[in-house]
Amino acid sequence: MIIPWQQIAPETLDSLIEAFVLREGTDYGEQERSLTQKVEDVRHQLKCGEAVVVWSELHESVNIMPRSQFNGVD
């Protein structure tokens, strides 16, 4: 189930994004980006709809994923 990011408390959203960035360990090319930059990248993806916050009932957990990879029912 998609959780609208706008309905998440700002501090909680910050923590979710930061945990996601730290867990992903994505390679950003030749120039390493700071944690702050990576967090802002994910925040931008949420704002423009490229990424979504998802609740998994099965795992009882929240995750951030590309909208294109989400195949659940809203």
Curated annotation (Swiss-Prot):
SUPFAM superfamilies: YehU-like. Pfam families: UPF0270. InterPro entries: UPF0270, YehU-like_sf. Belongs to the UPF0270 family. HAMAP family: UPF0270 (MF_00690). This is UPF0270 protein NT01EI_3666. It comes from Edwardsiella ictaluri (strain 93-146).
